[in-house]
């Protein structure tokens, strides 16, 4: 912990410089002494940056079922325990395990170049050796019969299963710099290419799903060398990386630029050769768990306030914003509350769910395993939208929950009242994030929205979602906001009614307790 303290001290010095330019405390904070202390502890002694270095840089990627995620679970328990907060890892099932090693992808003909790319999650490796092979582009077929007839031509090849983009410049760069006619032409070309490739995949009778899907399995059966794909995000240098269910043929994602290079060489019959050396280990079904931290309630210990953020992440980078940012916010909020409100009226839980990226698996399991928590839930605040300041809260279809939240917000410092827009009663959530398994049961669980910071381009699910993308001023502010809201929810004398707004309520989905393939 000595290194953590040294980093914390450097971060506190920087925070002190920033605070010199902030309005005085009396101008920021309400006269409620608890709110004042939350503000002081959260703003003056934040541990967000050293925690981020530990989670993102040292522990790193947290794919569900991986050793990295288990290490993060254990780190959370150890860290909470050091703060005097009870925490546990609660197992709910198993998921396919996988250990990511190094990825080396080279173009070796007609010229040499090391390519920017990485394995898809759960990809098999190359068995400790170089595998060199030619490439082939998945053609357009009339129907699945023609696809099956073509398969022998793919044997022993790396198969390209995505379009080569005509440009890797983001749309906003075209809008800012191209002539209107040129920008329109490029936009039309991109749209046509997307539609043509959608039809190309559908004609095979299979699907890529969220990676290689059932099509990948069929290509693997045909004896291919591997699958090459690309999912650029319309940002500079970023691409998304998801999953494969193949167990023999490796699957890799390349950057827009390097995929385009290989695609054009293949299209032009330049006979490119790729050499791959991929280290990976398929581990079979592995135990998976949520990490739950608890500050016990005093007077209403069977009523609950939940601070919610999923811990798992796609692992092309370190999952800093999706959803490491939410993890840090909830950890910091709990640390602040333990110091300021060690004996809240209601029990305050931090739920660090796993399996969110596989379909809200951990949070669904917890809601099934703990009906008493769902029944006694006063409020859940769920964070899953990156590093930005919380600037909106989505409704949950519960009028009484909306009324209480409006009251709580009205008692917060002016800076938060001006910053956070509440959407009112709204509609219940059908499954976008970890609040949904609670909200579908009629419990007050809401998603927090954040300032954008180009989240879709450079953060969620991409190869660039790393420590340096986190805005720690916003993390510090959000932790204070969440601690204040948890305090208000915990101490409110009234328990929130389950009366629902008119309309159709989404059905709850069961939690899979072991790997459930997504092939279509």
Where are these regions (language model features)?
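Short helix-loop-beta-strand segments that form the rim/entrance of peptidase-like active sites
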Residues: 50, 82, 336-361, 380
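Metal-dependent peptidase/peptidase-like ectodomains
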Residues: 110-114, 128-133, 152, 156, ...
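N-terminal capping segment at the start of a domain
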Residues: 30-66, 92, 102, 234-243, ...
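Second-shell loop/turn segments in exported
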Residues: 35-43, 57-67, 133-141, 147-149, ...
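Bacterial N-terminal signal peptides
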Residues: 10-22
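Soluble metallo-hydrolase cores and metallopeptidase-like ectodomains found primarily
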Residues: 32-34, 123-148, 236, 241-320, ...
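Active-site-adjacent substrate-binding region
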Residues: 196-209, 213-216, 220-221, 226, ...
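Noncatalytic luminal/extracellular "stalk/propeptide" segments of secretory-pathway proteins
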Residues: 29-34, 53, 57-194
